[in-house]
Amino acid sequence: MIYILACCAGNVKNANVFIFQMAVWLPGPNRFYLPPQPIQRTLNTEEYVRRTSTFLHAATDRLLTVGHPFYNITNADGKEVVPKVSSNQFRAFRVRFPNPNTFAFCDKSLFNPDKERLVWGIRGIEVSRGQPLGIGVTGNPFFNKFDDAENPYNGINKNNITDQGSDSRLSIAFDPKQTQLLIVGAKPAKGEYWDVAATCENPPLTKADDKCPALELKSSYIEDADMSDIGLGNLNFSTLQRNKSDAPLDIVDSICKYPDYLQMIEELYGDHMFFYVRREALYARHIMQHAGKMDAEQFPTSLYIDSSVEGEKLNSLQRTDRYFMTPSGSLVATEQQLFNRPFWLQRSQGHNNGILWHNEAFVTLVDTTRGTNFTISVPEGDASSYNNSKFFEFLRHTEEFQLAFILQLCKVDLTPENLAYIHTMDPSIIEDWHLAVTSPPNSVLEDHYRYILSIATKCPSKDADDTSTDPYKDLKFWEVDLRDRMTEQLDQTPLGRKFLFQTGITQSSSNKRVSTQSTALTTYRRPTKRRRKA
């Protein structure tokens, strides 16, 4: 409100005073936000997938692998003769299950192929590990250690190193970070790592004299035998540590990946990770310093005060701030084990509640608690007397796995709404179900050569050559085929008996189908005992 005071001209004593009130609109201090545009809602698989009362069990044989714990061994021709097998590697299993739509079920009314399609749903998984608990050791015979930051008197003076221009590399080993990890999904797990970023051309953000490259966070699928983080970070050591002395032998020329949990959790359909369990433990065993030229990034002189005594002045050539620590995985105990125990899937972290659309599951794991490296010695000729040169020393690492699954048979109605949603999510699912999708008419007359591979015709197109529809054909996985290892007799398998006990489901003696009858005990009231008359 605005008030206006008005006075009439004339005698001031007899002046008339008038007050006018006027309303004025002012913009409000609050901002107005328009609602966002509506987006398509992502459905949970429980909204369009119906579960049945049929459960099946599938398990692998004993899966074994043997190799060198630090590097691949090749012969004179460059052919790999001994693979690299380390406890710090990822094990990425690609488990294939049979197509349930081709099953011959005893119950003919189980599903209608004209109106429904069958899919598998994971209800339980157990990853069993053999071999005793043990701590692995990794190291480098030429490790870049300039000084001991914990006890400097055991550093460069003991090694007679006087400046950065010398070679201060030593043979150093340590036990890596302790990691237990299990990721289960319908698609491969994703990992992240740091690598050299591409230089900006227009405009250039880096100067010509810049020595340190820019970093970029990259993401890729976790493949079998990829290295995990051992406590020195997830980065591409082959491009970011060119001296090959700042890391152990098993990762000095490798990429250490860390699971990209943020990206897999935020995935729209939740296929890459149904659930995950992990346990990581480490502490700083030793604190040291790396040697190297520091002219590019020298620590400022304003951060320290030099000595006034001429003989005690700080020698900057022997001082470096490139501190690092050697990790240690600490104690390994059976009470801390995540393996050799079942995991039951009731609700996934994403929208896919354990449905295997392409009849395959991806199991990614790391277990460093069984990292013992075997030392094998073989004599050269007659070894009647001991001499170091008379024995060959070898290193080997072994791993043992077994995977077991409980699968539930599920049905999807072939309604237009379901097919439209599934086609938007993954068109290859519709193709695997052998359902035709009407394509728009094409008025262009195409050419089809009969002898396309002969030298008389043109070269075939790349699309014609690529007949494989596998999206992961270029990735490396541990292939496991369980298409002929399915059984409905849950009470005859270890994981099946655990599942029956946990869920309270009873199995009929005919072993042809599984029923979900309740096993609750019925209590009876004992009748009152009458007192006999005397």
Curated annotation (Swiss-Prot):
Forms an icosahedral capsid with a T=7 symmetry and a 50 nm diameter. The capsid is composed of 72 pentamers linked to each other by disulfide bonds and associated with L2 proteins. Binds to heparan sulfate proteoglycans on cell surface of basal layer keratinocytes to provide initial virion attachment. This binding mediates a conformational change in the virus capsid that facilitates efficient infection. The virion enters the host cell via endocytosis. During virus trafficking, L1 protein dissociates from the viral DNA and the genomic DNA is released to the host nucleus. Residues 507-521 have a biased composition (Polar residues). This is Major capsid protein L1. It comes from Human papillomavirus type 41. Self-assembles into homopentamers. The capsid has an icosahedral symmetry and consists of 72 capsomers, with each capsomer being a pentamer of L1. Interacts with the minor capsid protein L2; this interaction is necessary for viral genome encapsidation. Interacts with protein E2; this interaction enhances E2-dependent replication and transcription activation. InterPro entries: Capsid_L1_Papillomavir (IPR002210), Capsid_L1_sf_Papillomavir (IPR036973), dsDNA_vir_gr_I_capsid (IPR011222). GO terms for molecular function: structural molecule activity. SUPFAM superfamilies: Group I dsDNA viruses. The lineage of its organism: Viruses, Monodnaviria, Shotokuvirae, Cossaviricota, Papovaviricetes. It is found in: Virion; Host nucleus. Residues 507-534 are annotated as: Disordered. Pfam families: Late_protein_L1 (PF00500).
